[in-house]
Structures are given as C-alpha cells and as structure tokens.
A protein has these predicted regions:
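Extended, low-complexity, charged intrinsically disordered regions
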Residues: 155-159
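Basic, amphipathic alpha-helical bundle interface domains used for macromolecular binding and assembly
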Residues: 1-149, 160-161
C-alpha cells in the first residue's frame, strides 16, 4: 500500500476527496448462508441499503434546497461555500489548527469544508459541527501524517481534544 501511494503525486492525491483504509474481506463472508438464516441476513442487508439510500436522498434534498442555484455541496466555491457553512468559533479553531498542523493546501482546505458540509447533511444537521470537520479531515488523511507514516493515534488525540 505504501509503495502504491508513493507513486501517486501529492497534487493528484489532493484532488481525491475521501481516502479510506479498507481491510480485505474474509472470503467466507462472501458466500451466502442458506436457509432461513441466509434469508434473514439478506433481508437485513437490504433494509440497511434502503435506509442508506433514504439518508442520501434526504441529504441531496437538503443541499438543493439550501445551496445557491440548487448546487450540490461539491460544486460550491468561495463565498457560496462559506455562506452555507456558517462555522462557529470552535469549528473555525479546529479547522485552523488542523490546516496548520497538516499543512493543508487551499484546495484541501476547501475540499475538507465541502466534505464536512456533506457529512453534516447525511447526519441531518443544519450546521457543520466539530465532529463533522474531524470526520472530513480523517477521511482526507486516512493513515497519513506529515511525514507520510501511519499515525492515527496522534490524530485521535487532536480530534478528541
């Protein structure tokens, strides 16, 4: 994984909004269970998928209703972005601290804000809170530190404080 990431340029990585570390799936989990147990599991997964779909549709509806010209969050720029954020003091402090600590570029900074607004929409929140910003930053940084090494423990300390 590290060798692969080293081959991708910083500016290209900067254009990817969400970085996730995903563990391999146990092959046994890929085989469906048979009988009643399997039907119940499939039904549970279907209900989860429907709930997630509904959550996404509600978030999209909130964006279209709130944002200028009905733009999705990822299309907001400049003043339009800052108007829909209306960050409080704590949120601005966290964002400033993280921007300095992680040397966020202007592009990364804007992408974190857009992602935080989307996370807030998915949570059904009218305002962007520190938790939404922390989650957006965690998705932007997934396993990276200033020197490229994995260090999620120091991130947890920063985000929980």
């Amino acid at each position: 994984r590290t060798r692969y990431l080293e081959r991708i340029s910083g500016p290209l990585l900067d254009r990817i909004d969400i970085h996730l570390l995903i563990e391999p799936v146990d092959p046994k989990l890929l085989l469906p269970e048979s009988g009643a147990r399997g039907r119940l599991e499939r039904q549970r997964r279907l209900e989860e998928a429907r709930a997630l779909r509904d959550q996404v549709l509600q978030a999209r509806a909130a964006q279209w209703a709130r944002n200028p010209s009905g733009l999705a969050n990822h299309r907001l720029e400049g003043n339009a972005l800052h108007e829909v954020l209306a960050l409080g003091r704590k949120e601005k402090e966290l964002l400033t601290l993280c921007a300095e600590r992680f040397s966020l570029s202007a592009r990364s900074h804007s992408r974190v804000l857009r992602l935080a607004r989307t996370i807030a929409d998915l949570a059904g929140s009218d305002t962007v809170k520190t938790d939404h910003i922390a989650q957006a930053l965690a998705h932007r940084r997934a396993g990276q530190t200033l020197d490229g090494e994995e260090d999620q423990e120091s991130d947890r300390t920063l985000f929980s404080g």
